[in-house]
């Protein structure tokens, strides 16, 4: 029987860890009062070393499918732009140079393109696609709401992402705030066939693909649970779910106490 292995983060003082597709290296983010820095280590935690230099804000790293590049966001030049670097720390390369906010890059399977979040158009967080060779970028999504955490499917046919797309949540009992619900969507790399695959009414995010490109793993919590997490005096609770992209069927993968975010599929 095929078993799904996951690496996930628990909300605490630690940061998101990302295992290389070869399962031999871990990439993680270290937070300090004045900077955010990327580190890399062996899969067993040994050999920890810095990947980027201190003094700048580097965050939201993502491995390329072959494991030869890491794309990340950096504010070292003043605005949030995309950079890439080899796992040994060589070949630092600035990919975008725009006054808008460019963030959350994800490589295509052939590593020739990167889908990312940007505020270049309409002052909203939409998805764009960057040609790594030419450095030309094109718009992928538009409309109301924000689109976040894009992830390219291993077969290259879909891009999964989370979006609030105008969905609002009524105020919780005794509170005046409103919070947008967030769903998981799919879109083709050419911008066609946009569809929602998560059950509406929850707060779902950080989609990741299974290796067969047939399912998406994401964290989900009920709308009411989000209030506990936001105010800090109560413990929130999320579960990781596996969503079949053909049927929309959702099955829990990891549940129980605690706020679980940013899953990474290992196999």
Predicted feature descriptions by range:
Residues 21-49:
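An edge-strand/N-cap motif at the start of beta-rich repeat modules
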Residues 8-17:
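Bacterial N-terminal signal peptides
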Residues 62, 106, 151, 208, ...:
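Conserved beta-strand position repeated across blades of beta-propeller domains
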Residues 21-22, 65-66, 109-110, 154-155, ...:
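Residue-level detector of Asp-centered blade-edge/turn motifs that repeat once per structural unit
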Residues 30-39, 52-57, 73-83, 96-101, ...:
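A flexible loop/linker signature enriched in serine peptidases of the S9 family
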Residues 42-46, 86-90, 131-135, 188-192, ...:
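Short loop/turn segments that connect beta-strands within beta-propeller blades
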Residues 26, 70, 114-115, 159, ...:
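Hydrophobic beta-strand positions that form the internal "hydrophobic ladder"
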Residues 48-49, 92-93, 138, 194-195, ...:
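A structural motif specific to WD40 beta-propellers
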